[in-house]
Structure formats: C-alpha cells, structure tokens
C-alpha cells in the first residue's frame, strides 16, 4: 500500500517504472545457456550479496562483465571477513593481510564466519570465485590482486588502530583516508579495468584525483546518511574536526534539543562531500563506453539525490532514510547520457541551495561551493550562447563534444522509450475511461 501511495503522489515515477520495465533496451544481456555451472553459481552469489549491484554488473559489456563480477565478489569476501565480529583478531588479521595471496590458489575457502553472517557463502564457496578469477586475462587478474592487497592491509591497519577504535575519525584528513581505503581503492581498480579494456580515456588512470573523488563522494554520502544506524551499532565515522564544532559527543545529535546543531553539522558534511563533484563530472566525461558509463554514473547520481535528501532533514538523526524506489528508477533512466547526469546534478544542487538558510553557519560556504559547480556545469553545457558567439574551448567542453558521438544514439533510444511509454499509458487511460464511462451509463 505504501508503494502504491508513493506512485499516486508521484505519477511521473509511475511512467519511469513502466519505461524501465517494458521498454528500456539491454543489448548486453547474459545468456546463462552458454555459461559454465561455475560461472552461473558466481552470478547467483553476486545476486545473493547485492541485487542492485548484480543488476548493473550483468548489463556490462561482455569484455568487463565477468571481470567486475569477480572483482566485486573478491572484495565482498574480504569485507565479510573484516565486518564479522565473531572472528578473533588472531585469525582475522592474517586472513586480511594475506587475502591477495589466496588468489594464486584454486581451491582456498574459509568457513570461519558466524553462521548468521549473511554473506558467508562467498567465502564458503570461494573456490568457485577463484575458478573464474583464473579465467580472466592476466592484466585484469593483476589489478584485482593489487587492489585486494591494498584493501586487506588497510582493513587490518584500522582494526589494529586503537585510537580509531576508541575515538573514531578525528580529522578531515583521517576521514578522507578512511573513505579512500573503503571506496577510493575500488574506484582505482575499476578505473584501471576500464582503461585496460579501452573503454575510457587514458587520463582516467593518470589523474588519480578523479577516481579518488568518485569513491570519496559515494562513501561520504553513505556515512552522512547512515549516522543513526552507525550510532546504534557503536560505530563513528563522522570526523570530530567537523562534528566537534556542534556537540560534545557525536551521540548528542540524537537528542531533540540538539537537532539544530545536528542539522548544521550535516550541512558542513554535505559541503565537504560536494567538494568532490567537479572531479566526478570530469571523470564521467572521460568514460567512453556506454555500459561502463552507466555503471559509473548510476551510483553518483544516487549520491547527489541522497545528499539532497539528507540536507536539512532531521530524520537522519533518528532513523534511516533513503530515496524512493520510483526516484531511483527515474535517475537510472535519465543518467544514461552525460548531459542527463549534468542535468541531475544541477537539479539537486539547486534543491540543496533552496533549502539552505542564512542561520546555518555553513550558508555562505555552501553557496560558494554550489556556485562553482554550477559554473563548471555551464562550461560543459552552456545554457545560452548569443548568435555568432562560439563557446569558449576548454578541456571539459572538448570532451563533452567528443562524447556527443556516444550520447546521440542513446538519446534516440531514450526518446523512443518515452514515446512508447506515453502511448501505452494513454491507451490504458482511454481504456479505463471507457470502462468507467460504460459503467456510469449503465447505472
């Protein structure tokens, strides 16, 4: 009933769901009939651990589909060891630090997780993942192994860091480093894979700040959103350098009398996350294969929509919040072109700016940050260019023009999907009206 009410209140999202389910094209669908039993099982494990990631991964170009599936499962297995508090550190730390070495084997498994650990299956059946890992091209294996080594050691370092375990993250520098180990390293690996497949401009792997920002923007958004959940679990990821300006203890924001200070703290955290947006837009402009672009773009547009949701939202301090399913579908459909992504970012940035209030200590900083991003977006897609004037040639504008070759076919597909959706909904509307009219006449 709740979902039906949401659709009734947001009819545009109903159209998006119809378009997504019935008319969206997928030219890279898997064909399980041609796959080995081991490969099929790996995709089953992928769906068991994350249905949302599985859906996007399964639509990737065949060159990278299995590569990124294996990469995700390897890192999920690593994470499943790290988060399981039932595993003694004497066991956990060596496994984390040596996990990359297990990739050289073909039959290693691990059954030391708690029976209640929901993702333990990826470790119990890790030999199947290893089988598919060894089917990959050597250059892809090398990337996966390198990132696994860095992430495993990073996880172990944080477990052994008594200051972090006692006090959480203290400085913004600590915050950035933690987010890099959790998400920036993933961005590093994915970027290397995309460039190796020749699906992205080589600048992606040269300018490391771009892929770092991709990961940090996502992770910081999740950390802001998950405040209440982390507090309940006894975890602290908001940096004290920020929250210490507004409270004596991080948990104070859960008290009703501290709501205003909590919202101001969220405001500063949002400002900090928005500092990565220009890098994110530059990164997306350099991805030159459609399915890889979709894979990179979808999480980023979800992140900016989530930042708008958490901004000035007191519910973040007392409960878990998330964007509506219909909104998610709309964002997936709109983000299939670079111009669509730019439009989404502009829309949500303006919503954030509109919700900001002069009483917020971060009001001026927020306005300046959003203004810089809007100026960058104008450089990508100038709103108004007087007749006879040629837009200024910049590196981002040059890349945008180059990407038009990729975006134009997708724009045509999107227009076709929208037309079919409207025809279907109009036909259904006419049919329903006819039935109602007939019933009324009989009565």
UniProtKB/Swiss-Prot annotation:
Pfam families from the xrefs?
SQS_PSY
Q: How does it sit in the membrane?
A: Multi-pass membrane protein
Which gene is annotated as encoding this protein in its UniProt record? ERG9
Question: Which species does the entry assign this protein to?
Answer: Cyberlindnera jadinii
| Keywords in alphabetical order | Endoplasmic reticulum, Isoprene biosynthesis, Lipid biosynthesis, Lipid metabolism, Magnesium, Membrane, Multifunctional enzyme, NADP, Steroid biosynthesis, Steroid metabolism, Sterol biosynthesis, Sterol metabolism, Transferase, Transmembrane, Transmembrane helix
Broad class of where this protein is predominantly found: endoplasmic reticulum
Under which name does UniProt file this protein? Squalene synthase
Per UniProt, subcellular location reads as:
Endoplasmic reticulum membrane
Q: What does this protein do?
A: Catalyzes the condensation of 2 two farnesyl pyrophosphate moieties to form squalene. It is the first committed enzyme of the sterol biosynthesis pathway. Required for the biosynthesis of ergosterol.
The pathway entry for this protein reads as: Terpene metabolism; lanosterol biosynthesis; lanosterol from farnesyl diphosphate: step 1/3
Q: Which domain of life is it from?
A: Eukaryota
């Amino acid at each position: 009933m709740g979902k039906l009410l949401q659709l009734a209140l947001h009819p545009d999202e109903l159209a998006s769901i119809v378009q997504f389910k019935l008319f969206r094209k997928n030219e890279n669908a898997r064909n399980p009939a041609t796959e080995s039993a081991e490969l099929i099982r790996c995709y089953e494990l992928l769906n068991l651990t994350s249905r949302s990631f599985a859906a996007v991964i399964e639509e990737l170009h065949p060159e990278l589909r299995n590569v990124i599936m294996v990469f995700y499962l390897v890192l999920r297995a690593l994470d499943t060891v790290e988060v399981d508090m039932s595993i003694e550190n004497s066991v956990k730390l060596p496994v984390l630090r040596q996990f990359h070495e297990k990739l050289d084997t073909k039959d290693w498994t691990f059954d030391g997780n708690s029976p209640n650990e929901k993702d333990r299956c990826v470790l119990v059946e890790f030999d199947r993942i290893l089988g598919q890992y060894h089917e990959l091209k050597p250059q892809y294996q090398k990337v996966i192994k390198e990132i696994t080594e860095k992430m495993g050691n990073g996880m172990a370092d944080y477990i052994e860091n008594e200051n972090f375990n006692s006090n959480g993250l203290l400085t913004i520098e600590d915050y950035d480093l933690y987010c890099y180990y959790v998400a920036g390293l993933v961005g590093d690996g994915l970027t290397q894979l995309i460039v190796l497949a020749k699906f992205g401009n080589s600048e992606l792997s040269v300018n490391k700040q771009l892929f770092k920002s991709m990961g940090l923007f996502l992770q910081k958004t999740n950390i802001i959103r998950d405040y209440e959940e982390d507090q309940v679990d006894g975890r602290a990821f908001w940096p004290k350098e920020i929250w210490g300006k507004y409270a004596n203890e991080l948990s104070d924001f859960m008290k009703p009398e501290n709501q205003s200070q909590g919202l101001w703290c969220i405001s500063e955290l949002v400002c900090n996350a928005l500092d990565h947006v220009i890098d994110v837009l530059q990164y997306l402009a350099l991805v030159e294969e459609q399915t890889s672009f979709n894979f990179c773009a979808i999480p980023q547009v979800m992140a900016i929509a989530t930042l708008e949701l958490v901004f000035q939202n007191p519910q973040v301090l007392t409960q878990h919040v998330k964007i509506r399913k219909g909104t998610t579908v709309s964002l997936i459909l709109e983000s299939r072109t670079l111009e669509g992504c730019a439009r989404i970012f502009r829309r949500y940035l303006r919503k954030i700016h509109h919700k900001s209030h002069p009483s917020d200590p971060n009001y001026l900083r927020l306005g300046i940050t959003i203004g810089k991003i809007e100026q960058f977006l104008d450089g990508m897609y100038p709103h108004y260019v007087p007749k006879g004037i040629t837009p200024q040639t910049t590196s981002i504008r040059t890349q945008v023009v180059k990407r038009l070759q990729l975006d134009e076919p997708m724009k045509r597909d999107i227009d076709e999907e929208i037309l079919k959706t409207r025809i279907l909904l109009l036909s259904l509307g006419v049919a329903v009206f006819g039935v109602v009219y007939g019933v009324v006449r009989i009565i």
